[in-house]
Amino acid sequence: MNVYNKADSFSLESDSIKDVIHDYICWLSMTDEMRPSIGNVFKAMETFKIDAVRYYDGNIYDLAKDINAMSFDSFIRSLQNISSKKDKLTVYGTMGLLSIVVDINKGCDISNIKFAAGIIILMEYIFDNTDMSHLKVALYRRIQRRYPIDDDEEDR
């Protein structure tokens, strides 16, 4: 971790969106007191939470509380739950939802670290290469525009 948390720029050619997401999820899993300050890359990642709220019809925090990756059964139920709502949430909203899930469950003990690892694995199942490309371009554009979330339709 700590490669991207203070980064202010992101390159479409040389940076990995998966690495950014992994670092970001690890950062989110820390308590607020333990989190190091962040740069533009993570500030732009935070905007995906806004997408989750915007695109989900119900209370996104209720849905987030139902997501759990601590056991195999709960992992599968969470995967099915997110997959069934992915068309409503969009790729951006799904990224935001999973960010909210980790933020809700943050902490210092080992179970929070396992939880964050479970969410990272869950993302590997949910996001395909096309989704990752969309996230990469959206992140790049949000950094360039200093985080506005009004991405073009072609980004989705």
UniProtKB/Swiss-Prot annotation:
Keyword vocabulary terms for this entry: Early protein
Keyword flag Ubl conjugation: no
Record's keyword annotation contains Magnesium: no
Reported induction: Expressed in the early phase of the viral replicative cycle.
InterPro entries in the record: Poxvirus_Bcl-2-like, Poxvirus_sf
Protein species of origin: Variola virus (isolate Human/India/Ind3/1967) (VARV)
Entry protein name: IFN signaling evasion protein OPG029
Assembly mode: Interacts with host TANK, TBKBP1 and AZI2; these interactions prevent interferon production. Interacts with host STAT2.
Pfam families assigned: Poxv_Bcl-2-like
